[in-house]
Amino acid sequence: QVMEGYEPVQGDGPLDFDDVWKRYEEMLDWVVGTYVEALNIIHYCHDRYAYESIEMALHDSEIVRTMGCGIAGLSIVADSLAAIKYAKVTPVRDETGLVVDYVTEGDFPIYGNDDDRADDIAATVVHTIMSKIKAQPFYRDAIPTQSVLTITSNVVYGKATGSFPSGHQKGTPFSPGANPENGMDTHGMVASMLSVGKLDYNDALDGISLTNTITPQGLGRTLDERVANLVGILDAGFVPDDCAEI
């Protein structure tokens, strides 16, 4: 048990979405509070013991302080909640009663495929966490921001985390940033871009990343084809529908 005062899901039957979401939000209150408290301590100690006087001497006189927070594993959380909501997820417990795995029956929407059912859950998770972050007191009245960025900790976190209702296995890396779960985006690059585009930037002003890889051969056979297809992908993923033609 990581912390006291939080009751686990009871019984061996299928998980109920509303019950899980309620418990998830309660747990987020503790996680966010502990996280922000740690950040406040870190920045206080940095100012006290390693103040960056040279850097601050070169800074603008009007200082706007921000506090960068971040989340990882967004796609796994979104897919797991979608599985609980739209499929049948039954927890598997060990001899102590601890949930160590899940049996998921039926289909469920997957984040990263331009499916509003899963994408809306992802956006709600980001918004909920940022709302809880904003409610915390910050060192030197810093303005809190949140990132959903590609960082190497997605590998470390995965090694220390158990299995999920989405099918993500214990000890395996999280997908980076706001990427869909590894291997779960089946509708192409543009669909994944459209899913990520549904995350509200106001909830993640520190940045949202989507890491995609494509070979030149995958874009087309000739240089002209590759240029045209790459432009088409960028236009489809980044140019709003109501944007005026340039």
Show where each model-derived region lies.
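Acidic, glycine-enriched catalytic cores built around paired aspartates
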Residues: Q1-I246
